[in-house]
Amino acid sequence: SVGFKAGVKDYRLTYYTPDYQTKDTDILAAFRVTPQPGVPPEEAGAAVAAESSTGTWTTVWTDGLTSLDRYKGRCYGIEPVAGEESQFIAYVAYPLDLFEEGSVTNMFTSIVGNVFGFKALRALRLEDLRIPVAYVKTFQGPXHGIQVERDKLNKYGRPLLGCTIKPKLGLSAKNYGRAVYECLRGGLDFTKDDENVNSQPFMRWRDRFVSXAEALYKAQAETGEIKGHYLNATAGTCEEMMKRAVFARELGVPIVMHDYLTGGFTANTTLAHYCRDNGLLLHIHRAMHAVIDRQKNHGMTFRVLAKGLRMSGGDHIHSGTVVGKLEGERDITLGFVDLLRDDFIEKDRSRGIYFTQDWVSLPGVLPVASGGIHVXHMPALTEIFGDDSVLQFGGGTLGHPWGNRPGAVANRVALEACVQARNEGRDLAREGNEIIREAAKWSPELAAACEVWKEIKFEFAAMDVL
């Protein structure tokens, strides 16, 4: 007969390869697959590998013009998920050649771009990625990283303190600057634009940048400490975003900010390169992440979004609190906190880490804990996150009964007390309340803060459990 072997073949005949030995250069992915009834797991896993690499639904003539063996994704392992009847973890290996160098955008378009709407699957979740060293090396990564940031700020041996300025929408630039000044003057290291403060009618971006810079220079002069305010450069176009970043640099401020998921990885990587070239730190907010990562069976985990951010570039990223008002299961959160900060992270399924990841000295990212936290959480936060973190109290600073500056004082006193106690060998988990109470005896600001928030709890079970 003429022609080639046309027709529809099972994916597993080509894309399920249980004997495949993964290469050091492969990008490896772990997917949580929930097939439709009647679809065998091998076929579902192979379908994921095919549709996210070289495959399509039928054999095509042009397959003969290339080497599938060289370019195809391969499903090389399938394991059942404990306690879930029809759910599997499918491991897929992708050859490095499938990806454009230095493009997080292309990596995600390839791996998660198309396959999540696939009919043979009820649901699909990307649990983890192993980024090979060869691919990591094509990325600049964070603009500066943890060590350089500490050197720039001259702050060592403790977590950094921040505060999001509230009410997040509606303040004029002048009043916004007043709020920034009071917080920094009271003892915080940073204040922050909210993620949705961009350039609205009540406060245009340029006025805000000028007011905040004035506030931080005044606070810096009075305290002798280096201060920062995260100026949110996120905008409707990349050109506008860069214009804002350039103006921030002209003001001489130390740090700008970007919403990396709503702004997109392409814009984020552009900004990160500019920040490294011009000595600006880059704070990253993860607005929209829960749309993608909160469902247990579908979407992708935050650890994947966090890896993508470390490659694209950012010096800080919000990462949940474990104790406040927003999602964050302790082991899972600590798993991706290590993926952000450390150079080498061992596979550890108990923390949701499916692969050993070597970052080959790509700079680390400081995790930012924020959302419903206050002074009474300080011992737990210091214990959980350690020194390399930013603890951000929005309402937990500005909600102080005496105002912003006393709120900032209370937080700084609580933090210094916890760090000192830890350095003296005390157990923060057990003696935390006692440590805060002792400090409150000589700090009226802290005593007042403890009084206001002594009863507040955000007690709900976490959604994302292993």
From Swiss-Prot:
Function: RuBisCO catalyzes two reactions: the carboxylation of D-ribulose 1,5-bisphosphate, the primary event in carbon dioxide fixation, as well as the oxidative fragmentation of the pentose substrate in the photorespiration process. Both reactions occur simultaneously and in competition at the same active site.
InterPro entries in UniProt: RuBisCO, RuBisCo_large_chain_AS, RuBisCO_lsu_C, RuBisCO_lsu_C_sf, RuBisCO_lsu_fd_N, RuBisCO_lsu_N_sf, RuBisCO_lsuI
Pfam families membership: RuBisCO_large, RuBisCO_large_N
SUPFAM superfamilies cross-referenced by the UniProt entry: RuBisCo, C-terminal domain (SSF51649), RuBisCO, large subunit, small (N-terminal) domain (SSF54966)
Cofactor note: Binds 1 Mg(2+) ion per subunit.
Family: Belongs to the RuBisCO large chain family. Type I subfamily.
Anything else known: The basic functional RuBisCO is composed of a large chain homodimer in a 'head-to-tail' conformation. In form I RuBisCO this homodimer is arranged in a barrel-like tetramer with the small subunits forming a tetrameric 'cap' on each end of the 'barrel'.
A GO CC annotation given for this chain: chloroplast
Entry's Gene Ontology molecular function annotations: magnesium ion binding; monooxygenase activity; ribulose-bisphosphate carboxylase activity
Name of the protein: Ribulose bisphosphate carboxylase large chain
Entry annotated with the keyword Ubl conjugation: no
EC number: 4.1.1.39
Binding positions for substrate per the UniProt entry: 114, 164, 168, 286, 318, 370
N6-carboxylysine sites (modified residues): 192
Modified residues (N6,N6,N6-trimethyllysine): 5
Residues that hold Mg(2+) according to the record: 192, 194-195
Cofactor: Mg(2+)
Annotated positions for site Transition state stabilizer: 325
Enzyme class: lyase
Record's subcellular location: Plastid, Chloroplast
Quaternary structure and partners: Heterohexadecamer of 8 large chains and 8 small chains; disulfide-linked. The disulfide link is formed within the large subunit homodimers.
Post-translational modification: The disulfide bond which can form in the large chain dimeric partners within the hexadecamer appears to be associated with oxidative stress and protein turnover.
Keyword line: Calvin cycle, Carbon dioxide fixation, Chloroplast, Disulfide bond, Lyase, Magnesium, Metal-binding, Methylation, Monooxygenase, Oxidoreductase, Photorespiration, Photosynthesis, Plastid
